[in-house]
């Protein structure tokens, strides 16, 4: 009783009901592990017709090329859905450059495209105990490569590994905030 937060509307402090004032729509995302770009594209087109409006492709770094991206995204309208990608942390800049090149070739309005390229340096260190390259240099190159995609998120914090390792929710949140601060 007496809590003012129960009267808060979306878009109002303390943002308990989200930040969207006009609607509270969320993306429905499907993750696809890409074994072959043709099969992943067929699966993506099938699930897009079933209501999914966000795709997440886990691509193999060794196979990245302009043809690979073109085959993977064939007949998918990048302006109509959210596209998310993850690959080996050492190849995220290459992936970003290939995506920007593909989007420019298809004459998309780059300011309208939404999505992400998963670069989470700390998660790799936590999960594998290995550092892969220079974090600052890679992050800078990735941000520069995606500068023309203002609605693409490229620096991520994936705290799920902590949860899977047995962390409580408050520990997971605390570490995630600390990583974000780093």
Question: For each predicted feature, which ranges?
Answer:
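Catalytic alpha/beta active-site cores
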Residues: 1-182
């Amino acid at each position: 009783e007496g809590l003012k937060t129960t009267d808060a509307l979306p878009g109002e402090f303390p943002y308990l009901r989200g930040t969207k004032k006009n609607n509270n729509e969320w993306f429905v995302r499907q993750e696809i592990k890409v074994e072959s770009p043709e099969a992943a594209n067929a699966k993506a087109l099938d699930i897009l017709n079933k209501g999914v409006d966000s795709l997440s492709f886990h691509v193999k770094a060794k196979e990245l090329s302009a043809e690979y991206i073109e085959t993977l995204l064939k007949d998918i309208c990048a302006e109509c859905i959210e596209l998310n990608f993850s690959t080996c942390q050492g190849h995220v800049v290459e992936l970003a450059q290939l995506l920007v090149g593909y989007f420019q070739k298809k004459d998309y309005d780059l300011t309208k495209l939404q999505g992400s390229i998963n670069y989470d340096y700390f998660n790799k260190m936590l999960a594998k105990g290995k550092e892969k390259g220079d974090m600052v240099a890679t992050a800078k190159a990735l941000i520069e490569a995606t500068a023309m995609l203002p609605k693409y998120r490229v620096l991520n914090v994936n705290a799920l590994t902590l949860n899977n390792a047995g962390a409580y929710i408050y520990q997971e949140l605390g570490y995630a905030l600390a990583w974000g601060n780093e």
